[in-house]
Curated annotation (Swiss-Prot):
This is Ethylene-responsive transcription factor ERF109. Its main location: nucleus. The gene is ERF109. Interacts with MED25. It is found in: Nucleus. InterPro entries: AP2/ERF_dom, AP2/ERF_dom_sf, DNA-bd_dom_sf, ERF_plant. The lineage of its organism: Eukaryota, Viridiplantae, Streptophyta, Embryophyta, Tracheophyta. Probably acts as a transcriptional activator. Binds to the GCC-box pathogenesis-related promoter element. May be involved in the regulation of gene expression by stress factors and by components of stress signal transduction pathways. The keyword Nucleus applies.
């Protein structure tokens, strides 16, 4: 649509300077907006020069040189307000596709560079390391490599030493047997309860473990008493008590005469 130019022209208006840009008329501004909208809706990459302008619609002052930098590359109008800021729909789609391809390629590169992905692609199995310290219940590893097993006696509220083993599995099975002896089938085991069904019944096993614990406690108490009596005061009274105790112990074993003579000969 072409609007007639009703603006009055002043004859005595001064000529614009060399560095002053050309001013667009309202008709030119409207044509620029319409062409830009048509360019966006149609989706064309390149737009032909606008044909709606006549030679008399463009006002060019006399002696004003043309500058190529002021001419729009889309609508070919000098002093355009922004045709270059509009993108065609197909250009936007291509730009989005390029961004998606870049993101996908970067993620694929990171995935291929990781050693876990390489191992999975090669058919290898990814194994998780098992914590050796907490591998079995009631088992601890000594600094020199062997494995020690112990269990807590629920009746006496004490720890029962089960021994030292070459492998962690042997120590774990020793713990399981002791746990079955204390708690029966309700015990928390390292291995299934079916593996121990052919073992000794639970009351007998519990009595054996309790007997071992009491025997070790009595031996340690006897050793401590003997050490106190031997290092006590060095008097005749302490020596006689110690000799009498040793004779009574030997008498219980059935060799009272020989042991008594031997002890008497030692202190004569």
């Amino acid at each position: 649509m072409h609007y007639p130019n009703n603006r009055t022209e002043f004859v005595g208006a001064p000529a614009p300077t060399r560095y002053q840009k050309e001013q667009l008329s309202p008709e030119q501004e409207l044509s620029v907006i319409v062409s830009a909208l048509q360019h966006v809706i149609s989706g064309e990459n390149e737009t032909a020069p606008c044909q709606g302008f006549s030679s008399d619609s463009t006002v060019i002052s006399a002696g004003m040189p043309r500058l190529d930098s002021d001419t729009c590359q889309v609508c070919r109008i000098e002093g355009c307000l922004g045709c270059n800021y509009f993108f065609a729909p197909n250009q936007r789609i291509e730009k989005n596709h390029q961004q998606e391809e870049e993101i996908t390629s970067s993620s694929n590169r990171r995935r291929e560079s990781s050693p876990v992905a390489k191992k999975a692609e090669g058919g290898g199995k990814i194994r998780k390391r098992k914590n050796k310290k907490n591998g079995y219940r009631g088992v601890r590893q000594r600094p020199w490599g062997k494995f020690a097993a112990e269990i807590r006696d629920p009746k006496r509220a004490t720890r029962v030493w089960l021994g030292t083993f070459e492998t962690a599995e042997d120590a774990a099975r020793a713990y399981d047997r002791a746990a079955i002896g204390f708690r029966g089938p309700r015990a928390k085991l390292n291995f299934p309860f079916v593996d121990y069904t052919s073992s000794v019944s639970s009351p007998v096993a519990a009595d054996d473990i309790g007997a071992k614990a009491s025997a070790s406690a009595s031996v340690s108490a006897t050793d401590s008493v003997e050490a106190e009596q031997w290092n006590g005061g060095g008097g005749d009274c302490n020596m006689e008590e110690w000799m009498n105790m040793m004779m009574m112990m030997d008498f219980g074993n059935g060799d009272s005469s020989d042991s008594g003579n031997t002890i008497a000969d030692m202190f004569q």
